[in-house]
Structures are given as C-alpha cells and as structure tokens.
C-alpha cells in the first residue's frame, strides 16, 4: 500500500508500508470509487490534486438503480423480469435496451447505460412499450375484444407478472 508520494528534482518517492521506492516518472491509475469493500479509495485522486492536476468530480457510472424501500417492496415480485425499454435521461440522452427488475431495483443494459448520464435529483423516463402506441393499441383491442379485461389486454404486450404488479399498484 502506498502511504504517500513526494516529488523533488530527481523524481518521485513513494512511501510504502515499511519501504520507499524512487522513480523518475509516476503514472497515477486511480481506478474508481464504487467498490470500497474491494479497496477502492480516493488516494489516486488526492495524489493527482497534490501535483496540481485537474481532477473532475467523480460519480458512479454503469451502475444499477437502487429503489427506496417502499417501492422496492412493491416491485420485488418482478425480480428477474426483463423487458424491452427506451430510457431517457433528463438531459435527453436515450438508450433502447432491455431493462431488468432485480431484488434491489432496476438494472439491465438500458439502466447501466443511462446511469452514466443521470445525476442525483434528476428524473429518468422509462417506456416499457417502446414499439407500440399504447393509446392506439388499447383502442384497437377494445374495438376487437370489447369484453377483454385491461389486464389481459396489457398481458399481450408485457410480461404477466409485470401487468399483475401494475394492477396491484393501482
């Protein structure tokens, strides 16, 4: 583990646990901060700042969205359900990929991609029926099958578990 880094006219000195290493050049490979349990720290960013390098604010990217407990409890029955989606960030960035409901929230390619463009406090818009105009679809189904329930009509386009969950949410 590197404890500190100093610079002088001859290069750099790295102080390790009980040892020192000198080098003419220094490469700072900071890694990310997303996995502190695996040893991720801000040390590399601090060293970069120490030597006057510009360090941009960090944020998570390519990560799932976790949900608050009340919403998570309502949607946990959907864990493992994957649906095609179009997901849009507040800045207008759009991804057309699968969305996966998990035991912790939302994941899948669409969510992982959009997470790099999302900022805390911003909204994302998720279209779970990106290939149809829902109003037109419902009008046609109502005309062709006037006695069919909304649940059965939606189950023609969405996984049954998702339709049942949406029905429970009201």
Q: Where are the model-predicted features located?
A:
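Short hydrophobic core segments
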Residues: 2, 20-40, 48-49, 99-104
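Acidic, glycine-enriched active-site microenvironments
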Residues: 9-15, 22-25
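An anion/pyrophosphate-binding glycine-rich loop and adjacent beta-alpha core
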Residues: 53-57, 63-170
């Amino acid at each position: 583990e590197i404890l500190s880094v100093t610079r002088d006219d001859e290069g750099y000195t790295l102080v390790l646990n009980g040892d020192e290493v000198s080098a003419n050049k220094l490469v700072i490979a900071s890694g990310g901060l997303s996995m502190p349990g695996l040893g991720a720290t801000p040390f590399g960013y601090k060293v970069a700042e120490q030597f006057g390098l510009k360090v941009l604010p960090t944020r998570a990217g390519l990560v799932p969205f976790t949900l608050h407990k009340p919403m998570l409890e309502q949607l946990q029955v959907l864990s493992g359900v994957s649906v095609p989606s179009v997901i849009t960030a507040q800045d207008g960035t759009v991804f057309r990929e699968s969305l996966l409901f998990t035991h912790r929230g939302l994941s899948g390619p669409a969510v992982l991609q959009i997470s790099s463009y999302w900022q805390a406090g911003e909204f994302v818009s998720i279209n779970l029926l990106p290939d149809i105009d829902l109003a037109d679809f419902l009008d046609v189904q109502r005309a062709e099958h006037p006695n069919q329930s909304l649940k059965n009509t939606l189950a023609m386009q969405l996984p049954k578990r998702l339709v049942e969950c949406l029905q429970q949410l009201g």
